[in-house]
Amino acid sequence: MPLIRTPRTLPRVLSPGEVDALAGALRTHRDRAMVAAMLLGGLRRCEVLGLRLEDVNTGERRLFLAEGKGGRQRVVPVSGRFFASLGAYLEHERPATAATTRVFVVLKGARRGAPLSASGVDEIFDGARARAGLVRATCHQLRHTCFTRLREAGMALEAIQAQAGHASIDSTRIYLHLANDWLEKEYLRAAEAIEAQAAGPADGAMQ
């Protein structure tokens, strides 16, 4: 008896307006750097929190991710906007007295200088969502938004797999389904080429 495949729920992708609203609601360079790491680099929340100062290669604009999912390590490029926010955070906000090598730390209160926790990131997102008037905007949605936009821009699926840290390319293929605008443009471009080839020189001419 054949198995019935259960449809997989596609992860939600943030619209450009939602991204702008969320970015505008962030209050610190630290928070902007964390969001940029997820939105522009596709990092998971745990990978952002696991970053250490020695993992940051500013000259080559790369990050070494030592604490990826499943224990897999990788080096990924991230855009200059992330490094600009990161530089501002390290120069102006990160306490010089912080005893940890973790990049992202608590900025205020009794735990000032201690590594930022997952619950701390969630609290930051809750506040930013409320100020932006958004119902949903999660760390994982930022990651999915990153890879969807990269695919729409023409990035090869194998390259996205490497950037995302997926063990199997099957996990990456979901971005073929998410990139609806990209798919439509690719189809229309190909269809127009086929139609042009199929049309004869006298096609549509008066007989």
List where the protein language model places each region:
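Short pre-functional
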Residues: 32-46, 62-64, 148-149, 191
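Basic, Lys/Arg- and aromatic-enriched nucleic-acid-binding interface segment
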Residues: 7, 12, 16-45, 70-72, ...
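Short, structured motif recognition centered on aromatic/hydrophobic residues
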Residues: 37-39, 86-89, 103-105, 125, ...
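C-terminal secondary-structure termini that scaffold catalytic or DNA-interacting sites
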Residues: 190-207
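Catalytic-site neighborhood detector that most strongly recognizes the C-terminal catalytic loop/helix
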Residues: 13, 67, 164, 169-189
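Conserved tyrosine-mediated DNA breakage-rejoining catalytic core shared by Y-recombinases
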Residues: 46, 50-85, 99, 170
